[in-house]
Amino acid sequence: MSINIEQAIIHEISQDSQGQLRCRLRPQPLLNSQAVEMMLEELHQTYTSKSGKGFGYFGIHGDDGEANPAFSNALQEYRAGDLGFVEFTGQASKLLQEELAKYDFSQGGFLLMSCYTSMASDFLFVALLSAKSSMTVLDDMELSQNNHLDLSNIQLAARIDLTEWQADKDSRKYISFIRGRAGRKVADFFLDFMGCVEGVNTKAQNKTLMNAVEDFVASSDLTKEERQQCRNKVFEYCSERFDEGADIEIKDLADELADQGMESFYDFARGGSYELDEEFPADKSTLRQLKKFSGTGGGVTISFDGGHLGQRVIYDPISDTLLIKGVPANLKDQLDRRLKGE
Protein backbone atom coordinates (compact mmCIF):
# COMPACT_ATOMS: atom_id res chain seq x y z
CA MET A 1 0.00 0.00 0.00
CA SER A 2 1.11 3.57 -0.68
CA ILE A 3 -0.57 4.85 2.52
CA ASN A 4 -0.37 3.92 6.18
CA ILE A 5 -3.81 4.26 7.74
CA GLU A 6 -3.99 5.60 11.29
CA GLN A 7 -7.75 5.90 11.76
CA ALA A 8 -10.89 6.08 9.66
CA ILE A 9 -14.58 6.51 10.34
CA ILE A 10 -17.87 7.01 8.50
CA HIS A 11 -20.83 9.05 9.75
CA GLU A 12 -24.14 9.47 7.92
CA ILE A 13 -26.07 12.67 7.28
CA SER A 14 -29.57 12.03 5.96
CA GLN A 15 -33.04 13.52 5.73
CA ASP A 16 -35.82 12.34 7.99
CA SER A 17 -39.48 12.02 6.98
CA GLN A 18 -39.99 15.76 7.61
CA GLY A 19 -37.07 16.68 5.37
CA GLN A 20 -34.84 17.66 8.30
CA LEU A 21 -31.17 16.66 8.22
CA ARG A 22 -30.01 14.28 10.92
CA CYS A 23 -26.60 12.89 11.88
CA ARG A 24 -26.10 9.19 12.58
CA LEU A 25 -22.71 8.99 14.25
CA ARG A 26 -20.61 5.85 14.38
CA PRO A 27 -19.45 5.29 17.99
CA GLN A 28 -16.02 3.87 17.14
CA PRO A 29 -13.48 4.03 14.28
CA LEU A 30 -13.62 1.56 11.44
CA LEU A 31 -11.54 -1.56 11.94
CA ASN A 32 -8.40 -1.63 9.81
CA SER A 33 -9.78 -4.49 7.74
CA GLN A 34 -8.83 -5.37 4.19
CA ALA A 35 -12.04 -3.72 2.97
CA VAL A 36 -11.15 -0.43 4.69
CA GLU A 37 -7.58 -0.54 3.40
CA MET A 38 -8.73 -1.23 -0.17
CA MET A 39 -11.34 1.55 -0.03
CA LEU A 40 -8.92 4.18 1.29
CA GLU A 41 -6.16 3.13 -1.10
CA GLU A 42 -8.58 3.49 -4.02
CA LEU A 43 -9.78 6.88 -2.79
CA HIS A 44 -6.20 8.05 -2.24
CA GLN A 45 -5.19 7.06 -5.77
CA THR A 46 -8.35 8.50 -7.32
CA TYR A 47 -7.99 11.77 -5.44
CA THR A 48 -4.27 12.16 -6.14
CA SER A 49 -4.78 11.60 -9.88
CA LYS A 50 -7.57 14.22 -10.11
CA SER A 51 -6.37 17.19 -12.12
CA GLY A 52 -7.49 20.77 -11.63
CA LYS A 53 -7.71 20.62 -7.83
CA GLY A 54 -7.97 23.84 -5.87
CA PHE A 55 -5.71 24.73 -2.93
CA GLY A 56 -6.36 26.77 0.17
CA TYR A 57 -5.94 27.17 3.92
CA PHE A 58 -7.94 27.63 7.11
CA GLY A 59 -9.27 31.18 7.02
CA ILE A 60 -9.22 33.61 9.91
CA HIS A 61 -12.64 34.94 10.87
CA GLY A 62 -12.72 38.65 10.05
CA ASP A 63 -9.58 38.70 7.90
CA ASP A 64 -11.07 36.11 5.55
CA GLY A 65 -14.74 37.07 5.72
CA GLU A 66 -17.04 34.69 7.56
CA ALA A 67 -14.56 31.78 7.73
CA ASN A 68 -15.73 29.45 10.52
CA PRO A 69 -12.81 28.39 12.77
CA ALA A 70 -14.75 25.59 14.52
CA PHE A 71 -13.38 22.79 12.29
CA SER A 72 -9.73 23.89 12.51
CA ASN A 73 -10.04 24.43 16.27
CA ALA A 74 -11.38 20.90 16.74
CA LEU A 75 -8.66 19.51 14.46
CA GLN A 76 -6.04 21.36 16.51
CA GLU A 77 -7.42 19.80 19.70
CA TYR A 78 -7.36 16.35 18.11
CA ARG A 79 -3.75 16.74 16.97
CA ALA A 80 -2.79 17.96 20.45
CA GLY A 81 -4.38 14.88 22.04
CA ASP A 82 -7.10 16.86 23.80
CA LEU A 83 -9.89 15.38 21.65
CA GLY A 84 -10.41 11.81 20.50
CA PHE A 85 -10.78 10.89 16.83
CA VAL A 86 -14.42 9.84 17.24
CA GLU A 87 -15.28 13.05 19.10
CA PHE A 88 -13.47 15.21 16.55
CA THR A 89 -15.18 13.59 13.56
CA GLY A 90 -18.53 13.75 15.36
CA GLN A 91 -18.10 17.50 15.79
CA ALA A 92 -17.14 17.77 12.12
CA SER A 93 -20.31 15.91 11.13
CA LYS A 94 -22.43 18.32 13.15
CA LEU A 95 -20.70 21.26 11.48
CA LEU A 96 -21.40 19.78 8.05
CA GLN A 97 -25.03 19.11 8.98
CA GLU A 98 -25.44 22.75 10.06
CA GLU A 99 -23.89 23.98 6.82
CA LEU A 100 -25.98 21.65 4.67
CA ALA A 101 -29.16 22.81 6.42
CA LYS A 102 -28.66 26.25 4.86
CA TYR A 103 -29.33 24.83 1.39
CA ASP A 104 -32.52 23.39 -0.07
CA PHE A 105 -30.77 21.06 -2.51
CA SER A 106 -28.87 18.96 0.04
CA GLN A 107 -29.79 15.37 0.85
CA GLY A 108 -26.66 14.48 2.80
CA GLY A 109 -24.48 11.42 2.33
CA PHE A 110 -21.76 9.44 4.09
CA LEU A 111 -19.00 11.56 5.64
CA LEU A 112 -15.73 9.65 5.47
CA MET A 113 -12.80 10.98 7.48
CA SER A 114 -9.42 9.30 7.66
CA CYS A 115 -5.97 10.15 8.99
CA TYR A 116 -3.14 8.46 7.13
CA THR A 117 0.52 8.88 6.24
CA SER A 118 1.90 9.01 2.70
CA MET A 119 5.31 10.13 1.44
CA ALA A 120 6.40 11.01 5.03
CA SER A 121 3.49 13.46 5.47
CA ASP A 122 0.39 13.13 7.63
CA PHE A 123 -2.96 13.78 5.94
CA LEU A 124 -6.60 14.12 6.90
CA PHE A 125 -8.89 13.02 4.09
CA VAL A 126 -12.48 14.29 4.17
CA ALA A 127 -15.11 13.19 1.65
CA LEU A 128 -18.88 13.23 1.39
CA LEU A 129 -19.71 10.01 -0.43
CA SER A 130 -22.98 9.02 -2.04
CA ALA A 131 -24.54 5.62 -2.54
CA LYS A 132 -25.05 4.23 -6.01
CA SER A 133 -27.49 1.53 -7.04
CA SER A 134 -26.21 -1.56 -8.84
CA MET A 135 -27.33 -5.04 -9.82
CA THR A 136 -25.80 -8.36 -8.86
CA VAL A 137 -26.50 -12.01 -9.62
CA LEU A 138 -27.28 -14.24 -6.62
CA ASP A 139 -26.27 -17.88 -6.18
CA ASP A 140 -29.66 -19.00 -7.50
CA MET A 141 -29.05 -16.83 -10.63
CA GLU A 142 -31.69 -14.31 -9.64
CA LEU A 143 -31.00 -10.59 -9.97
CA SER A 144 -30.78 -8.45 -6.86
CA GLN A 145 -30.45 -4.69 -6.49
CA ASN A 146 -28.11 -3.23 -3.88
CA ASN A 147 -26.40 0.02 -3.02
CA HIS A 148 -22.68 0.66 -2.81
CA LEU A 149 -20.44 3.67 -2.18
CA ASP A 150 -19.56 5.46 -5.40
CA LEU A 151 -15.78 5.66 -4.93
CA SER A 152 -14.80 6.30 -8.55
CA ASN A 153 -16.84 9.49 -8.92
CA ILE A 154 -15.97 11.54 -5.85
CA GLN A 155 -16.96 15.19 -6.23
CA LEU A 156 -16.96 16.45 -2.65
CA ALA A 157 -13.56 15.76 -1.14
CA ALA A 158 -10.66 17.60 0.43
CA ARG A 159 -7.29 16.59 1.84
CA ILE A 160 -5.40 18.48 4.54
CA ASP A 161 -1.63 18.15 4.68
CA LEU A 162 -1.34 18.12 8.46
CA THR A 163 2.45 18.14 8.36
CA GLU A 164 2.59 21.30 6.24
CA TRP A 165 -0.21 22.94 8.23
CA GLN A 166 1.64 22.56 11.52
CA ALA A 167 5.13 23.24 10.13
CA ASP A 168 4.29 26.34 8.07
CA LYS A 169 1.52 28.53 9.45
CA ASP A 170 1.96 30.98 6.57
CA SER A 171 1.28 28.35 3.90
CA ARG A 172 -1.79 29.00 1.77
CA LYS A 173 -1.97 25.60 0.07
CA TYR A 174 -2.05 22.86 2.72
CA ILE A 175 -5.69 22.08 1.91
CA SER A 176 -6.46 20.65 -1.51
CA PHE A 177 -9.99 20.11 -2.79
CA ILE A 178 -11.74 18.83 -5.88
CA ARG A 179 -13.17 21.41 -8.21
CA GLY A 180 -16.51 20.72 -9.83
CA ARG A 181 -17.21 20.27 -13.51
CA ALA A 182 -16.85 23.10 -16.04
CA GLY A 183 -14.19 24.84 -13.96
CA ARG A 184 -16.45 25.41 -10.95
CA LYS A 185 -14.97 24.72 -7.54
CA VAL A 186 -16.36 22.17 -5.14
CA ALA A 187 -19.71 23.21 -3.65
CA ASP A 188 -19.20 26.18 -1.36
CA PHE A 189 -20.81 24.46 1.61
CA PHE A 190 -18.10 21.79 1.70
CA LEU A 191 -15.32 24.37 1.98
CA ASP A 192 -17.36 26.56 4.32
CA PHE A 193 -17.95 23.81 6.87
CA MET A 194 -14.15 23.42 7.18
CA GLY A 195 -13.52 27.17 7.15
CA CYS A 196 -11.34 26.75 4.06
CA VAL A 197 -10.36 29.77 1.95
CA GLU A 198 -8.84 29.40 -1.52
CA GLY A 199 -5.23 30.54 -1.39
CA VAL A 200 -3.32 29.52 -4.52
CA ASN A 201 -4.47 29.90 -8.12
CA THR A 202 -2.84 26.72 -9.39
CA LYS A 203 -3.84 27.12 -13.02
CA ALA A 204 -2.49 30.67 -13.12
CA GLN A 205 0.85 29.60 -11.62
CA ASN A 206 1.18 26.73 -14.11
CA LYS A 207 0.23 29.01 -17.00
CA THR A 208 2.87 31.51 -15.87
CA LEU A 209 5.46 28.74 -15.68
CA MET A 210 4.56 27.67 -19.21
CA ASN A 211 4.97 31.26 -20.44
CA ALA A 212 8.35 31.52 -18.69
CA VAL A 213 9.51 28.32 -20.37
CA GLU A 214 8.40 29.58 -23.79
CA ASP A 215 10.19 32.90 -23.26
CA PHE A 216 13.28 31.06 -22.03
CA VAL A 217 13.61 28.83 -25.09
CA ALA A 218 12.77 31.74 -27.43
CA SER A 219 15.63 33.81 -25.98
CA SER A 220 18.15 30.97 -26.08
CA ASP A 221 20.47 29.69 -28.79
CA LEU A 222 18.81 26.28 -28.73
CA THR A 223 17.86 24.55 -31.95
CA LYS A 224 14.20 23.81 -32.68
CA GLU A 225 14.66 20.20 -31.55
CA GLU A 226 16.42 21.29 -28.36
CA ARG A 227 13.63 23.74 -27.58
CA GLN A 228 11.06 20.97 -27.81
CA GLN A 229 13.28 18.75 -25.67
CA CYS A 230 13.28 21.52 -23.05
CA ARG A 231 9.47 21.73 -23.12
CA ASN A 232 9.21 17.94 -22.87
CA LYS A 233 11.62 17.86 -19.92
CA VAL A 234 9.58 20.48 -18.06
CA PHE A 235 6.38 18.52 -18.70
CA GLU A 236 7.97 15.23 -17.58
CA TYR A 237 9.27 16.78 -14.37
CA CYS A 238 5.92 18.42 -13.55
CA SER A 239 4.00 15.23 -14.38
CA GLU A 240 6.18 13.24 -12.01
CA ARG A 241 5.56 15.78 -9.25
CA PHE A 242 1.81 15.63 -9.93
CA ASP A 243 1.76 11.82 -9.80
CA GLU A 244 3.67 11.90 -6.51
CA GLY A 245 1.32 14.51 -5.07
CA ALA A 246 4.30 16.86 -4.63
CA ASP A 247 4.76 20.52 -5.54
CA ILE A 248 6.71 21.90 -8.48
CA GLU A 249 9.91 23.48 -7.14
CA ILE A 250 11.38 26.08 -9.49
CA LYS A 251 14.94 25.56 -8.22
CA ASP A 252 14.62 21.80 -8.59
CA LEU A 253 13.19 22.19 -12.10
CA ALA A 254 16.04 24.52 -13.06
CA ASP A 255 18.55 21.93 -11.84
CA GLU A 256 16.85 19.28 -13.99
CA LEU A 257 17.18 21.52 -17.05
CA ALA A 258 20.80 22.34 -16.19
CA ASP A 259 21.58 18.61 -16.21
CA GLN A 260 20.35 18.63 -19.83
CA GLY A 261 22.68 21.52 -20.72
CA MET A 262 20.03 24.25 -20.39
CA GLU A 263 21.52 26.59 -17.80
CA SER A 264 20.18 29.66 -15.97
CA PHE A 265 16.42 28.94 -16.08
CA TYR A 266 16.10 29.74 -12.38
CA ASP A 267 17.65 33.19 -12.76
CA PHE A 268 15.56 33.78 -15.89
CA ALA A 269 12.28 32.83 -14.18
CA ARG A 270 12.99 34.70 -10.95
CA GLY A 271 14.48 37.75 -12.66
CA GLY A 272 11.54 38.44 -14.95
CA SER A 273 8.07 39.74 -14.19
CA TYR A 274 6.53 36.28 -13.88
CA GLU A 275 5.71 36.39 -10.15
CA LEU A 276 6.19 32.64 -9.77
CA ASP A 277 6.10 31.15 -6.30
CA GLU A 278 9.12 29.07 -5.32
CA GLU A 279 6.80 26.08 -4.94
CA PHE A 280 3.27 25.42 -6.18
CA PRO A 281 1.09 22.42 -7.09
CA ALA A 282 1.21 21.02 -10.62
CA ASP A 283 -1.74 21.22 -13.00
CA LYS A 284 -1.12 18.63 -15.68
CA SER A 285 -3.92 19.77 -17.99
CA THR A 286 -2.39 23.26 -18.26
CA LEU A 287 1.19 22.07 -18.71
CA ARG A 288 0.18 19.55 -21.37
CA GLN A 289 0.24 22.48 -23.79
CA LEU A 290 4.04 22.29 -23.64
CA LYS A 291 3.82 18.99 -25.51
CA LYS A 292 0.62 19.22 -27.49
CA PHE A 293 -1.47 21.66 -29.44
CA SER A 294 -5.19 21.03 -29.23
CA GLY A 295 -8.42 22.85 -29.85
CA THR A 296 -12.11 22.34 -30.51
CA GLY A 297 -14.61 24.55 -32.28
CA GLY A 298 -17.24 24.52 -34.97
CA GLY A 299 -17.46 20.73 -34.96
CA VAL A 300 -13.71 20.29 -35.49
CA THR A 301 -11.29 18.84 -32.93
CA ILE A 302 -7.54 18.91 -33.61
CA SER A 303 -4.66 17.66 -31.47
CA PHE A 304 -1.02 17.03 -32.36
CA ASP A 305 2.39 16.83 -30.73
CA GLY A 306 4.26 20.12 -30.57
CA GLY A 307 7.24 18.62 -32.40
CA HIS A 308 5.15 18.29 -35.58
CA LEU A 309 4.57 22.03 -35.92
CA GLY A 310 6.44 23.31 -38.95
CA GLN A 311 7.03 19.78 -40.23
CA ARG A 312 3.99 17.52 -40.56
CA VAL A 313 1.68 20.36 -39.53
CA ILE A 314 2.07 23.76 -41.21
CA TYR A 315 0.22 26.76 -39.79
CA ASP A 316 -0.44 29.81 -41.96
CA PRO A 317 -1.82 32.64 -39.78
CA ILE A 318 -2.48 34.83 -42.84
CA SER A 319 -4.89 32.39 -44.48
CA ASP A 320 -5.99 30.92 -41.13
CA THR A 321 -5.27 27.36 -42.28
CA LEU A 322 -3.51 24.22 -41.08
CA LEU A 323 -1.85 21.90 -43.60
CA ILE A 324 -1.43 18.33 -42.35
CA LYS A 325 1.11 16.16 -44.14
CA GLY A 326 0.66 12.46 -43.62
CA VAL A 327 -2.95 12.00 -42.55
CA PRO A 328 -3.26 9.35 -39.79
CA ALA A 329 -4.05 5.95 -41.32
CA ASN A 330 -7.37 5.43 -39.54
CA LEU A 331 -8.58 8.92 -40.48
CA LYS A 332 -7.38 8.49 -44.06
CA ASP A 333 -9.31 5.22 -44.31
CA GLN A 334 -12.52 6.91 -43.13
CA LEU A 335 -12.08 9.81 -45.55
CA ASP A 336 -11.32 7.51 -48.50
CA ARG A 337 -14.40 5.39 -47.82
CA ARG A 338 -16.58 8.48 -47.53
CA LEU A 339 -15.28 9.86 -50.84
CA LYS A 340 -15.91 6.55 -52.60
CA GLY A 341 -19.47 6.50 -51.26
CA GLU A 342 -20.13 9.94 -52.68
Swiss-Prot record:
Annotated PANTHER family: NUCLEOID-ASSOCIATED PROTEIN YEJK, PTHR38772
Species the sequence originates in: Shewanella sp. (strain MR-4)
InterPro entries cross-referenced by the UniProt entry: Nucleoid_associated_NdpA
Superkingdom classification of source: Bacteria
An annotated GO cellular component: bacterial nucleoid
NCBIfam families per the UniProt record, alphabetical: PRK00378.1
GO molecular function: double-stranded DNA binding; single-stranded RNA binding
Name of the protein this chain belongs to: Nucleoid-associated protein Shewmr4_2217
Record key words, sorted: Cytoplasm
